[in-house]
Structure formats: structure tokens, C-alpha cells
């Protein structure tokens, strides 16, 4: 089941309750050497998850909708957060700015990885789909999907710092690499670091953080991975939120107890990425 399939009724953003329910899937999250069964109740993540849920609820608050939301441009007849629709005028840009600020104020500016932070990437998919060449239709589809539901999209673009003196293809065994390719999609393995807030997201965009010379086609790949895709594992750093709960109360730690955006390492172990989730590959029908 896709996260957005948990939304009850017509195409619209998640409510807070639906967002929390959407996190109760088969994702593999590890912290302190143990697997997290439910990020919405685990003491390392639950308060941060509830903070995110409050943002989604605000989209349905009649007192806040004028500032936060607008009609979709996908033909769904629904509404979305203003930053999830491509701006076509100066007025649209000002509206997006105000909507971003309104959500930011709800965490006193302490959460930078809320669902709207990757809306800029999703907007580029809709505004300049031809840039993605053979994957232009994928770009349009993801722009529509994320806009209509306000899915929580994250990114992980930094390679593990194994040996900075070597070219990427010399340390490819730990980088995200295409293992094999079929007509249905690609299989990838490897790791990415600094996957901030990934434990609380629906999807993650995997790509590169800078222009780099890549001589191995199997390293040239960009795709979107569902958090509950088989073979995807997330290894999280220690939780400030959990430390706050152990050492005191939210009154003692008002910020870290509520607004911890946990950083993590992504590990992909022979993960299947369908063609519809792929945005860039160089190899085609490679025999492995």
C-alpha cells in the first residue's frame, strides 16, 4: 500500500492522524542496536512524529487554510500546501513564502526538514519535466502524487566518506550502485549518509550532491525509494528526544524533546526500484 492510499476520501493532504498511520508500515529503522517496531510510539521518534502531524492538521484548520493552502493544478479538485504547486506569478511566490513561514513558526523555526523542504524538488519535476528526458513522465507523475497528498519526501545525496583521495568508481562497493537491470526496474545496493528525518518520511530521493566525474555507468543513478521497500535499512544516530525523556521532561528540554530531526545512514541491500520510481540511469538492459 502506498502511503497516500491511507488518505480517506478524495485526493487531498494527509491529516495528522493519517500521517501517523502511514508511518506504521514495514520500514526497517534501527537505533541503539535494536529495530524500531513503530516510530510513532518509540521514545526516540514519537514527539517529532507528533510535531509533523500537527503540521498536517494545520492544512485542514479553517483558520489557517487561507495562509497555508491553495487549489491543486493537477485537475484533482483538491487543495495542497502552497509550496507544493509550481509558482506562476510573484503573488504565488509571496504566498509560498508565507506558507513556509507559517509552518516554520509551529516549530519555532527549529525543524528544517518538514515536509515542505523537499517541495522545491517536486516543483522542479513539474515545472521542467523535459529535463529528465526519457523519465519525463515519471517526473510529471511524482509532481502530481506529492502535490495532491503532500507526501513527506526526503533526500539522501551524500556518499559515505570512505576515501576522498579515490575516484567514485574505486570505492563503488559502498556507494549506491546498480546491481542489475530488468525491464521492470533496477536493483541497487550501497549506502548514503546524512539522511536527516528519513525515519519519519514516506519517500526518499536518492541522487548526487554535486557534479562529479563518474566513469562507471552503474553509479549514475537517481531514483525515489519508498521507506518500506524491502532491503532498505536506516541506521539512526542517538536520539536527542530520547535523551531528553531519560534525563528529564519536556519542560527541562523544550526543544530537543520535541524537534529532534534524527540523522541516519541509509543502506540498500539489493533493493528493487521500479521504472516508475526512477529518474536517471545510463545502463540499459544490462546482462549481469
Locate the predicted segments by residue.
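Conserved small/polar residues in nucleotide/adenosyl-binding loops
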Residues: 278-284
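Internal helix-loop-helix
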Residues: 57-153, 203
